[in-house]
């Protein structure tokens, strides 16, 4: 048993009576500002990611170096 059109209409009337028309419009305006701020933050993050990806390039034209991970130590005491 789900919500019918009559149930939804009654809920809307009760919400309008409880909050009033001005309060609901203020809430919807705040909700819209939140969505805009979220979208702006997501687009700013994508721009920063694109900038950081272009900066992190490695030029592999140098000579390779041989590095020994665990060099053996030579003890001078016998």
Curated annotation (Swiss-Prot):
GO terms for molecular function: protein transmembrane transporter activity. The keyword ATP-binding does not apply. One of its GO terms (cellular component) is TAT protein transport complex. InterPro entries: TatA/B/E, TatA/E. The keyword Cell inner membrane applies. Pfam families: TatA_B_E. It is found in: Cell inner membrane. GO terms for biological process: protein transport by the Tat complex. Residues 49-78 are annotated as: Disordered. Residues 57-78 have a biased composition (Polar residues). Coiled coil: none annotated. The chain crosses the membrane at residues 4-21. It is a single-pass membrane protein. Keywords: Cell inner membrane, Cell membrane, Membrane, Protein transport, Translocation, Transmembrane, Transmembrane helix, Transport. Belongs to the TatA/E family. The Tat system comprises two distinct complexes: a TatABC complex, containing multiple copies of TatA, TatB and TatC subunits, and a separate TatA complex, containing only TatA subunits. Substrates initially bind to the TatABC complex, which probably triggers association of the separate TatA complex to form the active translocon. Part of the twin-arginine translocation (Tat) system that transports large folded proteins containing a characteristic twin-arginine motif in their signal peptide across membranes. TatA could form the protein-conducting channel of the Tat system. PANTHER family: SEC-INDEPENDENT PROTEIN TRANSLOCASE PROTEIN TATA (PTHR42982:SF1). This is Sec-independent protein translocase protein TatA. It comes from Afipia carboxidovorans (strain ATCC 49405 / DSM 1227 / KCTC 32145 / OM5) (Oligotropha carboxidovorans). The gene is tatA.
């Amino acid at each position: 048993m789900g919500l019918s059109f009559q149930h939804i209409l009654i809920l809307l009337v009760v919400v309008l009576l409880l909050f009033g028309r001005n309060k609901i419009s203020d809430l919807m305006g705040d909700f819209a500002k939140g969505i805009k701020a979220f979208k702006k933050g997501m687009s700013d993050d994508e721009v920063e990611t694109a900038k950081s990806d272009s900066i992190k390039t490695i030029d592999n034209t140098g000579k390779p170096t041989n590095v020994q991970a665990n060099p053996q130590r030579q003890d001078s005491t016998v």
